[in-house]
Design a protein with these regions (language model features):
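Conserved alpha/beta enzyme-core scaffold
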Residues: 1-158
Length: 158
């Protein structure tokens, strides 16, 4: 994400480039955080695990992600709904699931970009993660972005 010193996603911290950012942790991107906190862009702060499962839900073709994570906290729409400023639209809603339990509904919406790193690629855009310490969620990130026609940008060594 960043290094607290202006690298990573902070290189894109410009209100003419970014209009909405959603994260589970903003600490490594102080410039992007400032844009959100100052109301220059829309900003959401959702629990990190929810963000991961939400992206997996997009990749899986779901319409939303339901969870009890965040109930009664700043994520709850009855509190702040995870919004970092007044400009940010409320996305999270409360619903009752089929078992009668109240859940937070994190709606699915198109993602425009996925940024990732890989070891190498070929002329067809196939990538390999042979030198990365952790594959993590890169595949689901790419699938989620491509679901709605977004772009995947990959930095490779070769």
């Amino acid at each position: 994400m960043g290094n607290k010193l202006g690298m990573g996603l902070d290189l894109l911290a410009n209100k003419n480039i970014v209009n909405l950012a959603l994260s589970g942790f903003w600490g490594f991107t102080p410039k992007l955080s400032k844009l959100a906190l100052d109301g220059d862009i829309k900003g959401h702060n959702w629990p990190l695990g929810v963000v991961r499962q939400w992206i997996n839900s997009i990749a899986s073709g779901n319409d939303s992600y339901l969870s009890n994570i965040g109930m009664g906290t700043f994520i709850d729409p009855n509190v702040d709904g995870g919004r970092l400023n007044a400009k940010t639209d409320l996305l999270i809603s409360l619903i009752t699931d089929s078992w009668g339990k109240e859940k937070l509904c994190y709606p699915i919406f198109p993602l425009d970009w996925a940024l990732m790193r890989a070891s190498s690629s070929d002329l067809h855009g196939n990538i390999s993660f042979e030198n990365e310490a952790l594959l993590g969620s890169s595949i689901n990130d790419a699938i989620a972005v491509k679901r709605f026609g977004g772009k995947v940008i990959v930095q490779v060594e070769k």
